[in-house]
């Protein structure tokens, strides 16, 4: 039971975007996809979710996703896009309930309010979604996908959170909270795949990561093995040093030292 993507190739028109990438994620782990802008992170995730045409194969819990019906997929995996635009004035509770409807699981009818409570927005349930800040909207969308696959394991099979930059517009406290939610989901037996830009948060929370560069996978493995000076410098095109404080006693703030109040 895992998520296995093999030889993923994506072209936009005649332009190759991904070049035969392989990617594997296991339940019980947080798997991250990192890399510079334009490296193919979101494209890889959208290929995995079936939102882009691609060559190659994606297997989820042993099944070829190209042979699965939409309702079968929505019952075992929930997708958080980078952004979501709603054309109608839904309340926060209505947005989150969309997740339960997509998940096709009536037994999770209490999941929407539980998910809103988990992201600390239960008191916003009756507010209109469009009235919220960008960061609050992102947390509502996270609650929606949590509600869709609320129980991390069903019938002995893991369920999956597929998240595209889940902390991009959040402050540090909410970033930590969201990543702790993903860690708890994985610890309960579910699988998490997240596209990330913040390397510090990735190092803190990811069990496994793939580093993309130029549409190829430059390295994959545990953070302590692949987050090296050489690999990161090659991927990002600038000299980077791991576990090195800034020179000349410069002020710096790391999430590693934070404790949420």
From Swiss-Prot:
Q: Which InterPro entries match?
A: AAA+_ATPase, ABC_transporter-like_ATP-bd, ABC_transporter-like_CS, P-loop_NTPase
Enzyme Commission number(s) of this protein? 7.6.2.-
Locate the ABC transporter domain: which residues? Answer: 3-239
Asked whether the keyword Cell wall biogenesis/degradation is assigned, the reply is no
* Localization (cell): Cell inner membrane
EC class = translocase
A GO cellular-component term linked to this record: plasma membrane
Q: Where does it primarily localize?
A: membrane
Query: Which is an annotated GO molecular function term of this record?
Result: ATP hydrolysis activity
Q: Which UniProt keywords apply?
A: ATP-binding, Cell inner membrane, Cell membrane, Membrane, Nucleotide-binding, Translocase, Transport
Q: Give one Pfam hit by family name.
A: ABC_tran
**Family per record:** Belongs to the ABC transporter superfamily. Heme (hemin) importer (TC 3.A.1.14.5) family.
Q: Subunit structure, per the record? A: The complex is composed of two ATP-binding proteins (HmuV), two transmembrane proteins (HmuU) and a solute-binding protein (HmuT).
Its job: Part of the ABC transporter complex HmuTUV involved in hemin import. Responsible for energy coupling to the transport system.
Indicate what this protein is called per its UniProt record. Hemin import ATP-binding protein HmuV
Q: Which organism is it from?
A: Roseobacter denitrificans (strain ATCC 33942 / OCh 114) (Erythrobacter sp. (strain OCh 114))
Q: Name the gene.
A: hmuV
